[in-house]
């Protein structure tokens, strides 16, 4: 099984943070966060888009189990998934924004292609 980054958080906090980050990303089309969080969120967001491309009821229920808002799931299935119907992965891109003032953490913008 694939190794996940721990992000310096307890398991429940990390899972909740990633679910919220992916939900926000799918809702707005882009999100600004640290590079390690963006890499983890990108993995899950791409899995959610791939599931949405299937478009069946089971895929919708699997996405609903991870994404926290029903409106975002509807948007994912109705608008985002058809946009990537002919693309096999690589739905996101990351732009480095440089170090964050205050703690120097490397910040990136994660966005849909």
Curated annotation (Swiss-Prot):
Name the record gives this protein: Large ribosomal subunit protein bL17
GO molecular function, one term: structural constituent of ribosome
UniProt keywords, alphabetically: Ribonucleoprotein, Ribosomal protein
Domain of life (superkingdom): Bacteria
Subunit and partners: Part of the 50S ribosomal subunit. Contacts protein L32.
Disulfide bonds: none
Pfam families with a match to the protein in the record: Ribosomal_L17
UniProt xrefs under InterPro entries: Ribosomal_bL17, Ribosomal_bL17_sf
Family to which this protein belongs: Belongs to the bacterial ribosomal protein bL17 family.
GO BP term, pick one: translation
Organism listed in the record: Clostridium novyi (strain NT)
Keyword Ribosomal protein: yes
GO cellular component: cytosolic large ribosomal subunit
Presence of keyword Magnesium: no
């Amino acid at each position: 099984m694939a190794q996940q980054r721990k992000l310096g958080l307890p398991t429940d906090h990390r899972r909740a943070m990633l679910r919220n980050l992916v939900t926000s990303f799918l809702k707005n089309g882009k999100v600004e966060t640290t590079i390690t969080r963006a890499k983890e969120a990108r993995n899950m967001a791409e899995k959610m888009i791939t599931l949405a491309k299937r478009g069946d009821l089971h895929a919708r229920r699997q996405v609903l189990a991870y994404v926290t808002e029903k409106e975002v799931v509807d948007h994912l299935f109705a608008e985002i998934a058809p946009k990537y119907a002919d693309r096999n992965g690589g739905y996101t891109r990351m732009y480095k924004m440089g170090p964050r003032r205050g703690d120097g953490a490397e910040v990136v913008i994660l966005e849909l292609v």
